Amino acid sequence: VSRHWPRRLKEELDARGLKVSGGTAFGALHRHGAWDSMLEHVRQVAALTAAAGAHHLVLIPPMYRDEKTGAFTESPELTAEQWAGFGRAADRLGRLLLDEYDVRLVLHPHADSQIQTQPEIERLLNESDSRYTNLCLDTGHVAYGGGDNLDLIRRFGERVGYVHVKQMDPAVLAQVAAEDLSFGEAVKRGVCVSPPAGVPSPAEVVAELAKLDAELFVIVEQDLYPCAPEVPLPIAVSTREHLAGCGLSGTRRPNVPQ
């Protein structure tokens, strides 16, 4: 990243009246030998994130299956040794980001990664320090891994630092389990759907988040690939209207219907 990029990014955002909620990077905290290269990449993203005035960095673990071929590239489960160092590595990175960039680390569970199921998410949270490592709750990926979003919010609400709202089609999830599909193939089959279809219910998620004593960025997503360029905009409009009906809008705190 050129040393001029952070300044240029800030200028371009300001010229368009845009604000950035956070940065996103991919990184393997369980691969001890990859720390230096991972940190170099994350530092570049953190510098741009801070320059844009944002204070969150979403870290997504690598997938253990090739997204295009479905081939396994490593074990779906971490070894005891890898787990032993995972929380420490996350905290080390989170502390560095906070001290040097004033950016908070939030880890993002992801389909076909070793942080996918609810037990894996809970283990990550239990083995890390809330001062440095917290959760980007992606409701769709949690559902994909068989987790309970509402339960996670209720029991680990203080660790939810950032949110991605997304819904999954239960029928396609059943195909994933029955046919051992990769996430890439699941997306091609339409696993990500627009509300009110799919799980979890956005209304229930918003209502549970509203109970937290926290101000959170909630990013609305729907994975669509491949897709024609004209497809996303109508979906974005209808999704915005539905979520507004659930009480989620541009306000600082959800106005949940009683």
Q: Model-flagged regions — what are they?
A:
Residues 1-56, 80, 84, 91, ...:
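N-terminal pre-domain/capping segments
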Residues 1-8, 28-39, 65-67, 111-117, ...:
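Acidic-and-aromatic substrate-binding clefts and catalytic sites of carbohydrate-active enzymes
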Residues 13, 49, 105, 138, ...:
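Conserved, mostly hydrophobic/aromatic
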Residues 20-25, 57-59, 105-107, 133-137, ...:
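Hydrophobic faces of well-ordered beta-strands that scaffold small-molecule active sites
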Residues 31-135:
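Active-site acidic/histidine proton-transfer and metal-coordination neighborhood
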Residues 87-199, 248-253:
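Acidic/histidine-rich catalytic cores of soluble enzymes
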Residues 196-212:
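A short, acidic, amphipathic alpha-helical segment used as a generic capping/interface helix at domain edges
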Residues 216-246:
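C-terminal/domain-terminus segments
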